């Protein structure tokens, strides 16, 4: 049986992640407070962000930028701004 969490991003109960996907205290916070649905949404945004901004994950500054965007998106209800992208609903 999967575990249930109250997702801070979606503000509703949902299935939690199966295991901690990110290291450290932030990873624990994500595991305890973010649902699979919200994590999947973040992964899509993350791929777009990496591609559009041409981020190199070997570069510490780029990883820090991505982590900052992740925290904003998952916990502060921030949206990922991607230049030139218009969501399908608009």
From Swiss-Prot:
Keywords: Iron. It comes from the Bacteria. Pfam families: Iron_traffic (PF04362). One of its GO terms (molecular function) is iron ion binding. InterPro entries: Fe_traffick_prot_YggX (IPR007457), Fe_traffick_prot_YggX_sf (IPR036766). GO terms for biological process: cellular response to oxidative stress. One of its GO terms (cellular component) is cytosol. Could be a mediator in iron transactions between iron acquisition and iron-requiring processes, such as synthesis and/or repair of Fe-S clusters in biosynthetic enzymes. HAMAP family: Fe_traffic_YggX (MF_00686). Belongs to the Fe(2+)-trafficking protein family. This is Probable Fe(2+)-trafficking protein. It comes from Aeromonas salmonicida (strain A449).
